[in-house]
Swiss-Prot record:
It comes from Human papillomavirus 52. Residues 74-95, 203-224 are annotated as: Disordered. Belongs to the papillomaviridae L2 protein family. Residues 74-94, 203-214 have a biased composition (Low complexity). It comes from the Viruses. It is found in: Virion; Host nucleus; Host early endosome; Host Golgi apparatus. GO terms for molecular function: DNA binding; structural molecule activity. The keyword Disulfide bond applies. It holds the Pfam family Late_protein_L2. A motif (Nuclear localization signal) lies at residues 1-12, 447-455. This is Minor capsid protein L2. One of its GO terms (cellular component) is host cell.
Amino acid sequence: MRYRRSTRHKRASATQLYQTCKASGTCPPDVIPKVEGTTIADQLLKYGSLGVFFGGLGIGTGAGSGGRAGYVPLSTRPPTSSITTSTIRPPVTVEPIGPLEPSIVSMIEETTFIESGAPAPSIPSATGFDVTTSANNTPAIINVTSIGESSVQSVSTHLNPTFTEPSIIQPPAPAEASGHVLFSSPTISTHTYEEIPMDTFVTSTDSSSVTSSTPIPGSRPTTRLGLYSRATQQVKVVDPAFMSSPQKLVTYNNPVFEGVDTDETIIFDRSQLLPAPDPDFLDIIALHRPALTSRRGTVRFSRLGNKATLRTRSGKQIGARVHYYHDISPIQPAEVQEDIELQPLLPQSVSPYTINDGLYDVYADSLQQPTFHLPSTLSTHNNTFTVPINSGIDFVYQPTMSIESGPDIPLPSLPTHTPFVPIAPTAPSTSIIVDGTDFILHPSYFLLRRRRKRFPYFFTDVRVAA
């Protein structure tokens, strides 16, 4: 059973005690002199200041900073700062913007109307000349009114393209004025723009292979939950209700937590000290969202919880961080020598043909190449030599009859005739004399290039002479 610890109450200040105990006369002995300023230190300063004058040195009960100007010699004057007065001007009148005026004020002035100057001279109507004639020879008097000269004025304005945006220039409206007046005025046109949809090309990249300070956006690496740190208490929960309704382990049947989403963080109100159904969940104020992890061969359901074991006078709560976990099922390791029966992916092809061995009534034996020991006699005008045929000469025998291994297996047919091979060469024969135990190499073979492991001119260990 837990007992509530007595709270520590702060003592009232001297001013608060003086306001309540002065009228009743129950004040402590050190409260009244401190508030009314009648302590020994206050008496010394009060009567000592009558005979001692320190001036503006700033020596007193305050901080020893020497006053605002600091400690300066007595023969000098402290520096004074000169205050400069500026001319007071009336404030600039800000004209308000009406509701129908545009919110963007253009930096280009609008069209300015320029007066044409002096009025155009009036030309009198052509009324002719007044001619007066007389009988005597007197000169004629002609009244001619002087006609003023017509004036031509040209006014133009130029814009600096550096400070103006490109715009569509439209012809100005015709001016109704007398005389010849040439003028130009800037025109303001509204900008038309087109909204072009932009596409963001997002490619996934590995965070370990990033070579620039601004990596390509993509999938971020998985952050560690920090469930098994030294500052986190590990608590194993056996009750399976921890996965479906964890609020039942923290509080008793409370309708406030009936419709709470258990996949998110659950906050509990701990304004009152109430016992928990499970003592492991005592003083829990928050259960964070769950996480499924695998550790040491098991599937684990985890939640982080915050406790409010202590609470300060300012209202701050202090508690431990607890990791609650529930092992769902173990992960069985796979056997090393486990035999897995495999099934064929494609159906086995069944041949529609069968071989009946009983139909074979003729058996073909393996043919052996015959070797004939027939003497071959060569006659020359000097000697007669007898050389056996099987001493290095190949003799091929081809049978004249056709051989088949069975009724269903045809063999290629062989020619029935025997090729003609002459026994004796048609070229003129030459006498060969074999005697002695050595040989003489022909001089033409000395200039041949030596080849590796090839000796075409070695016949025997006897001398050969033609």
